[in-house]
Each structure stands twice: as C-alpha cells, then as structure tokens.
Amino acid sequence: SREPSWDRAVQVQGQMFLETQAKGGLDVQLVYFRGFDECRASKWVREPRALVDLMTKVMCRAGRTQIERVLNHALRQAKEAPVDALVYVGDCCEEDVDRLGHLAGQMGARGVRAFVFQEGDDPVASRAFRDIAKLTGGAHCRLSSTSPDELRQLLGAVAAYAAGGVAALEDANRRQAHRVRLLTKS
C-alpha cells in the first residue's frame, strides 16, 4: 500500500508471529509491487526479524496496482506447496475486477484464503476486495485510521488462522477486539 501504511506494517508485522509460535511457527513470503511493472517476491522466511529486514529494504514508488500479479503468484506457490492464506493491504484497484474474481475463484478452489484489508473508501476497491475475499473464503475488512492497534490485531488473527486453522482463529477472536471477530463472518 502507500508509504505511511507500509511504514506502519513494518512496525507491527512482528505481532503476526506471536500467535503462531505455540503452533510451530509460520512461513511468510513478502510480495510487493511498485513503480512501473515491478512486482517482486522474497524467499519464504520463518523468523520475524528476517521479514522486518526484507520489508525495511522496500521503498514505495508511484505506480498502478498489480493485484493480478500478486494473485497469480499465490496460485503458482499453491501449486508447489500448500499456502494457507494471502494477506493483502491496499487502498485502490486499477484492474479488471472480473479477471481478479476469476483468479480469486481459482485460489478458493485450491484452499488459499485471501484476507484483504482496505484503507480508505474507494468504491471500486471495495467491490474488488470484497469479491476476492468472498471467492477465496477469506475476509475483507476496512481499516480504521483511528486505531493504531487494529492492523496489529487483525494480522495476528490471520497468522493464527494460517498456523492453526479455524480453531486458532476462533480462539484469537475470543481474546481480541470485535473487529477481529469480523474475520470469521465472510
């Protein structure tokens, strides 16, 4: 997403791993796009510090969204080994919503749930993000700019799901804020 959000994500990403330590950890791959036609994926990492190191090297650049490339990448990865979840944070969608929906349907058929967190209230993005979440069996949630802890809690809940399934997500829901409980309602 945009630079202020990226900086916040770098700061809070460690929370994702706290939920997973008791369940054997979580492998994470950073996929990002920026600028003109640049979309990159890191190697898979297990340690929170390794992900922070990868994220701090990324600089934001203006450019169109490349959500289709991210979804295609997730599908390719899921063909090689199970991918439990894709977390996407964004504020707009400048792509063909029907094409994204088709890819999301393929992801859902492979068991890859997308948890899509939306900044702002762009109606095209809302439709695209809601459809992606629904077709994958994941969740769409609008982020509030008033709560600095919200993204941390939501990412922790998604990490719990990825590491321990629906039961772990339900456990996280019992312990956390109402917004986290919304993840199980999609």
What are these regions (language model features)?
Residues S1-K43, E47-V89, C93-D96, G120-R130:
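Von Willebrand factor
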Residues G25, A81-V83, G111:
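A general structural motif
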Residues L30, A114-V116, G137-R142:
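Conserved beta-strand scaffold positions in the cores of enzyme catalytic domains, especially
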Residues F33, E119-G120, S145-T146:
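Short, ordered loop/turn segments at secondary-structure junctions
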Residues R46-R49, I132-L135, A159-A160:
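Short, hinge-like loop/turn segments at secondary-structure boundaries
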Residues C92-L135:
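VWA/integrin I-like adhesion module and closely mimicked acidic/polar interface patches used
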Residues H140-S186:
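C-terminal "exit" segments of structured domains
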